[in-house]
Regions:
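Amphipathic alpha-helical segments of tetratricopeptide repeats
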Residues: 29-34, 69-76, 110-114, 119, ...
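Structural signature of alpha-solenoid helical repeat scaffolds
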Residues: 39, 79, 119, 156-160
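TPR-adjacent "capping" and linker segments in tetratricopeptide-repeat scaffold/adaptor proteins
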Residues: 1-7, 38
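Conserved alpha-helical positions within TPR/SEL1-like repeat arrays
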Residues: 6-19, 26-33, 42-57, 68, ...
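Tandem repeat protein-protein interaction scaffolds
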Residues: 37-38, 45, 74
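TPR/TPR-like (Sel1-like) alpha-helical repeat modules
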Residues: 105-113, 117, 125, 129-159
Length: 177
């Protein structure tokens, strides 16, 4: 069974890379079930998270949320803080797509705190950018700027937009209060 689960996992990953998101989601589900049957709950949860991302890419946020639900707890029990944060981020992304912004914001903030504790700056930066966007949409401009500032602080801004934002935030920080 382990070989079969690995084969299906690889097929699902290949389909995902080819943008066959719905088919990939189905195969990730099959792989998750095989891992579950062999008692490998961590790998099963990882497959559910991959399934969630595939559903989100296919435009089905409700199924994405359902697929990722509870996986953060599996990772928390195993002590894998990084995967726990990623699972929370996947759930938050689905909630955001469903328009459930306060819930999404809460999960993004939990994910950010977990990632900060691991020193994982790139993923945390991505999460903080989502937090910034949600704060801006809710009319909390200063909180949005603070989140974006934090998002760009620990990583080297790569895109022209990020470089401009960094310069603007530096200017604002020098002039403020």
């Amino acid at each position: 069974m382990p070989d079969r689960a690995e084969q299906i996992k690889k097929q699902a990953s290949d389909l995902y890379k080819q943008r066959g998101y719905k088919q990939a989601a189905q195969l990730f589900s099959e792989a998750a079930e095989l891992y579950r049957l062999e008692g490998n709950e961590l790998e099963a949860a990882e497959m559910q998270n991959n399934r969630s991302v595939a559903f989100l890419q296919s435009g089905d946020a409700a199924k994405a949320l359902q697929a990722a639900a509870g996986t953060d707890q599996v990772f928390a029990l195993a002590g894998d803080v990084r995967l726990q944060a990623m699972a929370l981020g996947n759930q938050a992304a689905a909630l955001e797509e469903l328009g459930r912004h306060p819930e999404a914001l809460d999960l993004y903030q939990q994910a950010s705190a977990l990632l900060k504790s691991t020193g994982e700056t790139e993923m945390r930066s991505t999460i903080l950018k989502r937090i910034s966007s949600l704060k801006m949409r809710s009319g909390k401009a200063l909180e949005s700027l603070a989140a974006m500032d934090a998002a760009l602080t620990d990583v080297k801004p790569g895109t022209p937009k990020e470089k401009l934002l960094r310069k603007l935030l530096n200017f604002v920080n020098r002039r403020s209060w």
